[in-house]
Amino acid sequence: MSSYNVPDLAPGEIHREEEVIRRSRFIVSMARVQGPDQAKAFIERIRVEHPDATHNCWAFQAGPAGSTAFAGCSDDGEPKGTAGRPMLTVLLHCGVGEIAAVVTRYFGGTLLGTGGGWFMPIKAW
């Protein structure tokens, strides 16, 4: 069983959580997706909702649980491998398939480092 709190989402439902970490505002948006096209459409929807965000990092696992056939991620300008890849790792190991997540960041003036774990305190995980 997963140690991550992944919500049980109905098709079309978006789950959101917000957290402030060292003055940066993070908004996690998650949704069920059926295939890469739906995942990309969801990611674009979140980008449009937050056009002035510093970053919209994302990851999706659009196939069955545990499959990497339809998976992808992006750091969206954060240092390479510090946001999208850790998010994808969480999605691949949470035991849930057909899910996409976007972490929207509004920079608060403090660099959080490149360890990739800065998002782990976010309640949606």
Where are these predicted regions, by residue range?
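Contiguous hydrophobic segments
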Residues: 9, 92-96, 114, 122
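C-terminal regulatory domains involved in ligand/effector binding and gene-expression control
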Residues: 1-82
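Detector for methionine-enriched segments
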Residues: 1, 30, 87, 118-120
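Conserved interaction-surface patches within small, structured recognition/assembly domains
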Residues: 55, 74-110
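Glycine- and Gly-Pro-enriched alpha-helical subdomains that act as flexible
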Residues: 100-103, 110-125
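Solvent-exposed alpha-helical segments within well-ordered globular domains of core cellular machineries
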Residues: 37-44, 89, 119, 123
